[in-house]
């Protein structure tokens, strides 16, 4: 049986724009990684930074991709604001 946390990943326009320029295979891989973050929403990120509005966001390196995100526990969503290939 597959794991399910009840959380869903959601991409910002900026994160979605990052995916558009990738191959179909890489798009699927990155989306799978985003779903892994949603599967474990309480995991500790690699580090935190402040976004443009001064809110704390988490940064997590998964493979060759750095995900910047915040978790909205009230609605069980992981809001991915930026994805960067490192």
Where are these regions (language model features)?
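Basic, Lys/Arg-enriched alpha-helical interface segments
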Residues: 1-66, 70-86
